[in-house]
């Protein structure tokens, strides 16, 4: 946890624990290792594709809920008075790539738009995957009586080689819990076009095409789950070029936003929140 707009009182155990997790994961598995795993899984998934483009996998309703085609976009209601804003996420929520994560990340920048006196609970953990967030972030989020929850937990799962089926199952578990056990407005981001980032510049055109196809597949599943659980979607895939088209918006690691990039990212989130 990196910041609270207004403290909830004494230092909380969960605050200390999340700070420790971020410090521990700061030197986690290098991006190159994750990329190699990702490419191997993309190759396997492509090789297992049945004629006609369909895969051999079968999806149960629990894994891949069906949303009504005519279902309108989820509504986000921001009251005029103070609210508690909870951010579930990974290194981008922490603000990795910025000079001052506590104030320059997209989460505190989004929080700055909220009514005066609102509370920010940033549960972002560097290197976090969605499955881990079910036990490390979700219980805390539900305990804070939030009015707004943002979720961006997908890039690490995708790059680290988590299977599509496992990710969608965990995503539905998360969204079902948030939808059932809170009255918060829910906002969630999808995968941007990672092939446009400098970190993946060494990929061949074929590898980029395969990676892009998998990103689109994941985003289709994310959109279906978002519609099913009345979650407002932040479409970073279609709006991400606002970041990738400007080298100054990407940090030196070629993967995370720079301070200027986080400003743009926060604007994309806020526009989606406003509807």
Report each predicted region and the residues it spans.
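Methionine residue identity
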Residues: 1-3
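C-terminal motif of bacterial Sec signal peptides marking the signal peptidase cleavage site
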Residues: 45-47
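Bacterial signal peptide processing site
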Residues: 49-51
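Alpha-helical cap/lid subdomain in secreted, periplasmic
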Residues: 135-275
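Cationic, low-complexity basic patches in intrinsically disordered or flexible, solvent-exposed regions
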Residues: 8, 12
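Cell-envelope and extracellular/periplasmic
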Residues: 124, 128, 153-155
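Bacterial N-terminal signal peptides that target proteins for export
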Residues: 14, 18, 22-36
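Serine-esterase "nucleophile elbow" of acetyl-processing enzymes
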Residues: 59-126, 138-145
